[in-house]
Regions:
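Cysteine-cluster motifs in flexible loop/terminal segments that predominantly coordinate metals
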Residues: 2-33, 160-169
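Electropositive phosphate-/nucleotide-binding environments in soluble metabolic enzymes
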Residues: 5, 23, 51, 88, ...
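Short secondary-structure transition/capping segments
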Residues: 6-10, 53-54, 117-121
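Helix-loop-strand module that forms the ligand-binding subsite of alpha/beta enzymes
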Residues: 21-110
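Short secondary-structure capping/turn micro-motifs that flank functional sites
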Residues: 3-4, 49, 114-115
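Short, structured secondary-structure boundary patches
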Residues: 15-20, 54, 60-66, 120-133
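Glycine-rich phosphate/pyrophosphate-binding loop and the adjoining helix
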Residues: 104-169
Length: 169
């Protein structure tokens, strides 16, 4: 939506309560994420990085939901849109959320990016549109494969809680 999302202040309240103390869409998303089979996170490129809104949102979503294991082994991908440059840096930024939370990253034919200043220009980016179509196909396939594995009784690897190196080393 268009509602403002404040950034994470690192207070740790979500570690104790399972919810962010801020009352906005983040807690609702984390609750819905529990039932989701997969995720695609997207952003326009702003100064060779993700928009402040998506960065604030994902910081808080993964700080709160990540601590609860909400995203573990749920397929995910990042997509970005730019007028010209900064896409790979932005993808790297978004992909870190996925990689740091045990989420299988869904592939496509190339980097998950499109180019254009407006929707019409993006639709004319034939390569980018093909990448998005293949990403959607691969996402659907991976989610079906995971569901079939669960139905067949194939055990998931054991999840290990994250070990944190003490700060005073």
């Amino acid at each position: 939506g268009n509602d403002p999302i404040a950034g994470c202040i690192g207070c740790g309240a979500c570690a104790a309560t399972g919810r962010c103390f801020r009352q906005d869409g983040v807690n609702d998303f984390v609750e819905r994420a529990r039932e989701a089979d997969g995720f695609i996170f997207g952003s326009p490129v702003h100064y060779a990085s993700a928009s402040g809104a998506i960065a604030s949102f994902l910081d808080r979503v993964f700080m709160c939901g990540g601590r609860q294991g909400v995203f573990v082994r749920k397929p995910a991908a990042s997509i970005v849109s730019a007028r010209r440059a900064g896409t790979t840096a932005t993808l790297d930024q978004l992909n870190r959320y996925i990689a740091f939370h045990h989420m299988p990253m869904v592939p496509s034919l190339y980097w998950n990016m499109v180019y254009g200043s407006n929707p019409d220009e993006v639709r004319r980016d034939e390569e980018g549109m093909q990448i998005m179509r293949m990403l959607g196909e691969n996402m659907a396939w991976m989610m079906r494969a995971f569901a079939l594995a669960r139905e067949a009784g194939i055990e998931e690897p054991q999840y290990e809680p994250k070990i944190k190196t003490p700060k005073n080393r």
